[in-house]
């Protein structure tokens, strides 16, 4: 599954780079984080996703109201003020997934343009919940992450 987008912020490229190239700062952009452990360019975290709105149509799925997700990632391919790859693996309720998040930044007048693409391998998760539901949940998490990045820049 691939999700991509772009947005522009009214900040210098160095300020944007300072956040996306720092595992500790970038981890703070992720929504609903319960715990974070950072070691250089590596980070491990746990976060929650409120699954009620995605699983409510499944009878007996009330126990899935909050999904606890474990996620380990590494910042790779750093090209200062240009590009970073955040690659990681996660799991929830015994199901595994992997994400490769490519972030490219460029100067546009006095602003910075951020182009991003997330390649996500959902494995059995898409089969269990259905691709549409998982796509919506993943899109929501990605959009919250982008919104949190914008807030950090202010």
What do the PLM-derived regions correspond to, one by one?
Residues 33, 70-77, 99-107:
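Hydrophobic/aromatic beta-strand elements that line small-molecule binding cavities or substrate pockets
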Residues 38, 147-154:
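Short, highly charged C-terminal tails/helix-capping segments
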Residues 1-52:
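Hydrophobic ligand-binding cavity/cleft-lining segments
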Residues 2-6, 42-44, 68-70, 83, ...:
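Intrinsic-disorder/low-complexity, polar/charged segments enriched in Ser/Thr/Lys/Arg/Asp/Glu/Gln
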Residues 38-89:
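Glycine-rich portal/gate segments that line the openings of hydrophobic small-molecule binding cavities
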Residues 1-2, 6-7, 37-39, 94-104, ...:
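Soluble, non-transmembrane catalytic domains of enzymes that act on hydrophobic metabolites at membranes
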Residues 85-136:
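Beta-strand/loop substructures that line and gate deep hydrophobic ligand-binding cavities in soluble
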Residues 137-150:
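Short, well-ordered alpha-helical segments
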């Amino acid at each position: 599954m691939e999700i991509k987008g772009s947005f522009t912020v009214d900040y210098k490229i160095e300020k944007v780079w300072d956040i996306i190239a720092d595992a500790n700062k970038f981890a703070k952009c992720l929504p609903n984080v319960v715990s974070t452990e950072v070691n250089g360019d590596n980070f491990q975290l746990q976060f929650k996703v409120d699954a009620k709105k995605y699983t409510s149509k499944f009878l007996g799925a009330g126990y899935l109201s909050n999904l606890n997700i474990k996620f380990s990632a590494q910042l790779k391919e750093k090209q200062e003020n240009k590009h970073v790859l955040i690659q990681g693996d996660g799991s929830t309720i015994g199901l595994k997934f992997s994400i490769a998040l490519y972030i490219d930044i460029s100067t546009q007048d006095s602003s910075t343009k951020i182009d991003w693409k997330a390649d996500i391998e959902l494995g059995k998760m898409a089969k269990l919940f259905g691709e549409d539901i998982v796509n919506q949940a993943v899109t929501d998490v990605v959009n919250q992450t982008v919104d949190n990045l914008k807030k950090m820049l202010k």
